[in-house]
Amino acid sequence: MQANTPRPRCPDCNRPTSHCLCPLISPQPSATQLLVIQHPDESRHALNTARLLTLGLDNAQLLVCEELPPEWQAWLTDPHWQTRLLFPRPDAQPLDSRSCPAPLRLVLLDGTWRKARKLLHVNPLLQQLPAVLLDNPPTSRYRLRKASEAGALSTIEAAAEALATLEPGFERERLLRPFEALINDQISAMGDDVWQRNYR
């Protein structure tokens, strides 16, 4: 019996080539530098929004790890930059130009809440960064995951809101275009009945 042949995938967005999202990705600039630290378990997830996020920005990088490599520890402590962690810690300040003065580096953690907290736990340097949070975040469009915490957003949604808050003229919808297509494609694949029964 012949084994199933894996479907070819786009090397950039990592989607099956028949469902490649790259035509919807239009990278845009930002004065804010973004670092997305992704838990390794999340990198294998089909709905990987961190990859779409970093493809959609000229000034963003994706780091897949649990413990930060030494070179990234130096990046986080560069005295020429103001570095903030976008995470709803109890001491987090509302994100705005006062809590995030330029030149700014913004760090986001990508994973489930449990995995994100593990990233914080094993990296004391992340714990030491001043934390900021989104003030009155919108309802998530991530209709395929049930968040365990109120106001939770996917990584790409959180970044879009943060940059729209910090930088006048930033095109939030331009960044979210492939994300919307990804969600709609997954709902179409599972069928509306299944989606209604499990996610509505």
Describe the predicted segments one by one.
Residues R114, V122-R200:
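C-terminal folded domains that constitute the principal catalytic or ligand-binding module
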Residues C10-C13:
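Short cysteine-rich clusters marking metal-coordination/redox-active sites
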